[in-house]
Amino acid sequence: MKNLVENELWNTRHQFFETMRTDSSANVREAIGYIPWYFNLPDTTQKYEIAWKEIMDEKGFSAPYGLTTAERRHPEFRTRGVGKCEWDGAIWPFASAQTLTAMANFMNNYPQTVLSDSVYFRQMELYVESQYHRGRPYIGEYLDEVTGYWLKGDQERSRYYNHSTFNDLIITGLIGLRPRLDNTIEVNPLIPADKWDWFCLDNVLYHGHNLTILWDKNGDRYHCGKGLRIFVDG
């Protein structure tokens, strides 16, 4: 599988993993091209890391309300209308969640030089901020990348689209509790030093234990000392 993905799906000209037609590459960068990192599949070489630069490019996937499902520079971007399950560029939280999981894997498990925690944090901010509709918390099918308007927001099929792994992104990505097979507790928050003075992730069941992860910049929020602290069963 690894060899097939790297040899058949990598578009050398676009420097991106792309989907295939029956006889050729689709020749378009799509968010699904980050899925290989969801499984930590690509080699840990610099050859593939260039694909992540598209996350920060406004002609790539970067939009005012988050990450688009197709590159914005493509001539067919958002050309297929609205309301027909089109995946030609609008923001789908399902796809954004996959990309953010892949991004966290890439930042934690690869010796990369492309992304900083500021990039991940900003995309998480946009992901969270977009999940409102008419002033109330909401997650739906897909939204406009420029206005943030939920494209099927008032229809029943959209408002039950809670399939975006929101909790997992907070726990394993933002707070940074990295799942492992052994009994090591690995925590690597992807939060810039100047953003949050404190956070607490409490009552996390992990390998048969109850974890609490605290960040208290000055030590005056939780009164458990300054900095990052991890408590196991207590």
Segments predicted by a language model, with ranges:
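Non-catalytic carbohydrate-binding regions of carbohydrate-active enzymes
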Residues: 1-21, 50-210, 219
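Catalytic-core signal marking the mid-to-C-terminal active-site face
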Residues: 199, 216-234
